[in-house]
Amino acid sequence: LLNNYEKIDVIDDQIGIPTPTTLVTSTVEAIFFNENFMKMRGIYNIAPSGYTNWYEMARIIKLRLDLINTEKFSNKKINPVKSAYFASAARRPHYSRLSNEKLRKTFKINPLNWKVYFKKYIQEQIK
């Protein structure tokens, strides 16, 4: 969007955790190949630690873009707005974090902070 607009509005009141597919697949693999898999099967949440909102993610992306191409993105603006600013038929939760407690206790799997995965993803996209 920043390629096409001088200013974008991004929601800042919906809290969640961006979860990369690489985390999901590596966790499923670790669980599946666990020797006690059949005894411990069930429903588990998986998400990185920490939390954020859409505005914060957009801000981080812009900071990375500024490092790559200062002239192109330096004058672009990202404005935080509330969910009500955008008319939507779909209701969105304002707080949608998942708990990894069961996953931690059962399989001793402790995902890293979402920023670690997000930074890696952004770096891969820039290449």
Residue spans for each PLM region:
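NAD(P)-dependent short-chain dehydrogenase/reductase
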Residues: 1-16, 21-30
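Residues that recognize and position ribonucleotide moieties
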Residues: 8, 17, 50, 79, ...
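Residue-level signal for the nucleotide or nucleotide-sugar donor/cofactor binding architecture
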Residues: 16-19, 52, 98, 109-112
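Non-catalytic, hydrophobic alpha-helical segments
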Residues: 24, 46, 57, 103, ...
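Mid/C-terminal beta-alpha module of Rossmann-like enzyme folds, strongest
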Residues: 27, 34-89
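A hydrophobic C-terminal alpha-helical subdomain
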Residues: 84-106
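Amphipathic terminal alpha-helices
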Residues: 104, 112-127
